[in-house]
Each structure stands twice: as C-alpha cells, then as structure tokens.
Amino acid sequence: DVSSPEKLAPDLDRIGFVVNEKIGADTCERCHADIVEQWSKSAHRFASFNNPFYEATINDMREKALSLTKGVAEHVAHFPQWQERTGKIKSKWCSGCHDPSVMLAGQMTETIDRRSPQAQAGLTCLACHAIDQIHNTTGNGNYNIVDEHEDPYVFARAEKGSVGALLHDTAIKAKPEAHKRQMLPPFFRTSEFCSTCHKVSLPESVNDYRWFRGQNEYDNWHDSGVALNASRTFYLPPNKRVCQDCHMPLEPAPLGDVSAKNGMVRSHRFLAVNTALPHVRGDEDTIKRIEAFLRDNRLRIDVFALQRERTEGESETVLALDKTQPSLRTGEKVTFDVVVRNKDVGHTFPGGTNDSNEGWIEFTILDAKDRVLYQSGFV
C-alpha cells in the first residue's frame, strides 16, 4: 500500500511530515483498525524522514561524513560509481531500522525525495511483520525480510471497497490460520526479535573513529532481574517478562479489530519515553499516555540519610528522615544520601541512545514558609 504523493502534500505543506495518511497500512486497517490506529501514533511509525529529529541527523551524516573509511572503501570498490557518495553509503547503516522502505527501494545511496511515500512511511506494518528470521542478537537490523509475501487468499490484490476485497477479507476471517502463520511467527513474542533494532553499534567504518555502543536495550534486559538472569538484583518479578509485556500491553479494541480477544489487543503504540515526537505534531493524547506509562511505579526514590557536618572531619548521620524530621540551621552544611531504585524498567534507566538520554532528580529544599532555599535538577 503506497500512497500517492498528492495525498501526502497537505500534511507536508502544513507541518513538514505526513501525519494523517497511514502509509503502508491501508490493507491491514480493513481488519486491524485498532492496531493500525495505535501504530499511527507510535514512534515506530515516525522513524524515518517523517521524524524531523532523525531527518536532521541523518541528512547531516549523508552530507558531511565524507571520509573514505575501510569498510566504505571496500563497498566503493564494488560500486565505483558511488565514489562521491560516501556519506550516503554510511547512512545505509541506519536505514535497516529507520528507513526500510527507502532502503529496500534502493534509494539510500541516491538523493532522497523527502516528500515521497517511501521517505514518509516510517516503519510500516510489513517492516516488522515481513521479517521471517533474526540471524542473531548482534542488532543493527540483522534480520531477514521476505522478498514478497504471497497472500494465499483469493482476490489478494483487489482494491479497497471492491467486491473482491470483501471476498478476500471474508476468506481470511473464515480461515485465518495461514495468515497468522505468515504474519505472527513464534519468535515475534521474544525479546530477541526486538534486539535486531534496539541494540545498536557504530563501527569505525561509519564514524571514522572507533567502534562504540550506541544503544543496547537487549543485553541490559537479558542481564536484569526482569529476565530472571541476575543473581545480585534487589528486584525479581514473580515471572520473567519480555519487551512485549511492558511495551505492548493489552489495550481495549473499540474499533472491532478482528484479532481482539475478549475485546483486547496487544498495543502497537510501543510506549516508551519519547514525548518530543507527539509534541511536534500536537498529539496530547499520546503525551498523556507516555506520562502515565512512566509514572506507573517504574522507579523508587528514597532520601535515605542526612549527613550533618559537626566539626571538621566529623559528621552525624541521621536516618529515617520521615520519622525524625530534623530541622536545619542557617549556614549548616549537610549532605543528603539519595537512593534511586529501578523497580519496573526492564533495562537500565534511562534507556535509549547512550549519548543523548539523561535522567534528572529534582531536589528542592523549602523553609518553614515554603520558600525555595535550594533546588537541584529542576527543569
């Protein structure tokens, strides 16, 4: 399902990227209305040149990362016509997870038309559901995607709204087993499936510096108490949990999604911490959902102790501050011991890209009249 450029123009002219046209989901939406609606608000959907933050970053790389590194030189040796396209070649490293529609159309080494359906598609339904194998857990898009799904049902290529489309959808609903085998193999329910794009490295051939880790949710999860693999953790859930348990929880399906069980589907919002994307498109509902997700008992912060400086080199430790409630005198030097515990984040906090994500603890001291005396971490 590739939308025409004419349908994309209103959004592109208004906000700079496509919001209303659900590129690549037209056929799926006929049976999976709830899932498509959820996906349409997700960070997965806005992963490519329809993400202004990613677009600026990848374009900078394509225009300025011009050094002919060893890996790129070997690439150019096979394709000498790309001698002047080193930045574009390096951007292919990112495209397997951010721009599969552009990559599979063979456009990553070309000048990309950001107004094209491929550039505005993001991660479509088939970007995930056409994957038939994960080679290993090294990440960086190390998956195998089928060349073309052969739809086993009659009138597979019928146009939306036609009698053929109605017969096709009726056949799927009557005998969905073949469709389910194609679109939902067992490994889709594992964290290893997610590792293919949520474990990222940047090798020397890309950054002309050295290998370093860009993101690694998978190994952090694998070695955590949530995966029941950490003997020294202070937190063990009753049962092992995988990525999908937190990021694809059950959600009501009021639009009649045929895959719903007891009125619920696995959410395709993929909620995490990204509030910037919904903010730039004015999606207050998604921002509220993310805030609720993050405030659902994920972390615990305790002001564990107070160190009062008595004389030089000596101090007094005050524990159980909630019970003792010590008062402080003007000019007194104190140190607070604060303990932060990760209770319900299945990987390290904060997660995501290593170079840009930080967490703040807001710590405020008030006087007896609620006047602010000191603040740290206030945003």
Predicted segments with their positions:
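Conserved, well-structured interaction surfaces
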Residues: G96, P100-M108
